[in-house]
Amino acid sequence: MLPAIIFRQVQRPLHHGAATLEHVLGVGGSSFVNCLNRYAAATGFIRISFLDIKRRRNYELARLRLYADEKKQSLHLRTLQGRHLLQGVIERKNFLVDDIREARHKVQERVREKIDEIREERENIMTIPNMLTISRAVLSPYIGYVIVQGDFTLGMSLLAFAGITDLLDGQIARRWPSQASKFGSFLDPMADKLLMGSLVISLCYTDLLPMWLMGIVVFRDVFLLGAGFVIRYISLPPPKTFSRYFDATHVTAQLEPTLLSKINTGVQLATIGLSLGAPIWNYLDHPALQGLWYLTGLTTAATALSYVMNRHNTFKIIQKKT
């Protein structure tokens, strides 16, 4: 502290106080004064350097405070922005969750409605007429086999049984509506065609029926069978899967038999029965039997043509309930 005190006391060169110092200290000369001046200048420079350091330190502290305040303000703004962003994300998340929940609820409702529609479209196929029709269809190949083996008497008996089942299934379905089914409307003519095809092929094989008549009957039945598969595909609503296509309980179309088709069925059964009985009762190649062959060919071709001309009335697509 001594240099600073001396410096405060000596603020300017000591030329004017040389005599006093010489008198007090007992020294004299200009060299002593010069030494004092140099000492005062050095101590003043040191004091100025100390003041500069303090001033710079205060400046740096102020600058750091300002920088810290700016950073604090920036962090505060970012915190506010982050809170707003987080709030927006939470609101968006809640909106998406509600939207997904609502969409899932709608899908579940739609699935329930679709299941109810499919259940309504299904029908009971385990009816007595359908069982009789199925038994006739299963028996048809065996009747053909018996005829090919030459057992015409057994073949006649089985044919009579098949004819009785054909009459019974129709009577039961008309008398008791609960036993009627749209599936049966397709199954019955298909079983008749299977029976007729088995019989005409086996009778033609044993030379009891002409080849041309067999060709007409088989061609007509194959044509109608193919048309039935096409109509089934057209009338089946999406999705058109293999399992739904062959699902017998899911009926999409109905076959309306015509008067001509019923007459043709009777004529065909009479022709088959009489041709099968010819070797039993010995009237092979009888003119009346040959005339019946031509009549059967005519009615068979006429029914095929009528199905084509009146296909919109014969095959009815079942409209879905709205």
From Swiss-Prot:
Its EC number is 2.7.8.41. GO terms for cellular component: mitochondrial inner membrane; mitochondrion. Keywords: Lipid biosynthesis, Lipid metabolism, Membrane, Mitochondrion, Mitochondrion inner membrane, Phospholipid biosynthesis, Phospholipid metabolism, Transferase, Transmembrane, Transmembrane helix. One of its GO terms (biological process) is mitochondrial membrane organization. It comes from the Eukaryota. Signal peptide: none annotated. It is found in: Mitochondrion inner membrane. InterPro entries: CDP-alcohol_PTase-I, CDP-OH_P_trans, CDP-OH_PTrfase_TM_dom. GO terms for molecular function: cardiolipin synthase (CMP-forming). It catalyses: a CDP-1,2-diacyl-sn-glycerol + a 1,2-diacyl-sn-glycero-3-phospho-(1'-sn-glycerol) = a cardiolipin + CMP + H(+). It is a multi-pass membrane protein. The chain crosses the membrane at residues 143-163, 199-219, 289-309. Gene3D superfamilies: 1.20.120.1760. Belongs to the CDP-alcohol phosphatidyltransferase class-I family. Catalyzes the synthesis of cardiolipin (CL) (diphosphatidylglycerol) by specifically transferring a phosphatidyl group from CDP-diacylglycerol to phosphatidylglycerol (PG). CL is a key phospholipid in mitochondrial membranes and plays important roles in maintaining the functional integrity and dynamics of mitochondria under both optimal and stress conditions. This is Probable cardiolipin synthase (CMP-forming). It comes from Drosophila melanogaster. The lineage of its organism: Eukaryota, Metazoa, Ecdysozoa, Arthropoda, Hexapoda.
